[in-house]
Amino acid sequence: SDVYKRQFLRRAKTNILTDIPLDEVRDAFATTFRASGMSITDAQLSTAANVTAGYPYMIQLVGYHIWDAADMRDSDTIIDADVTAGIEEARIDLDNAVCIPELQGLSKNDREYLEAMAASDGPSPTVNVAQRMGKTPNYAATYRKRLLDAFVIRETERGEVDFAVPFLREYLRRNQ
């Protein structure tokens, strides 16, 4: 099944890409755009960098789509509308390539657990997740374990979990 394929791929030997500091993302965007003759403001660079949260795949998507938006206008000057459109397209691509496949094959209760986690802005105490679900901590622990085993969430400290998949919290909030 698709769940087992995703689990196999996650367990395969991989190179772990950590989040990139936002100042480095901003500098990389500036260097890339400007070295290619594109004009982009410091404010636009900051907006583009901040929205990526340093996630490597999102960096790639945002940069590509901002560039593409300006290119579609046949312009070498990035305007705010290019940044906005680029960010929107990057989110759509990330949702389709990462978030939607991640949720496929999960049970209704697995998803309910994730939606309860998404109510927090950061790591969620497991007791709060259970309360949001309207379930006992022991009941919710079954789904916590399944999601941990599937690498969808991670334990940040004892009794606390967070999303292991970047931007999944935001996707769930937009699509509840």
State where each predicted segment sits:
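Minor-groove-contacting beta-hairpin "wing" of winged helix-turn-helix DNA-binding domains
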Residues: 159-166
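A short, conserved structural fragment
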Residues: 148-158
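Short glycine-/polar-rich loops that comprise or flank the Walker A/P-loop
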Residues: 8-13
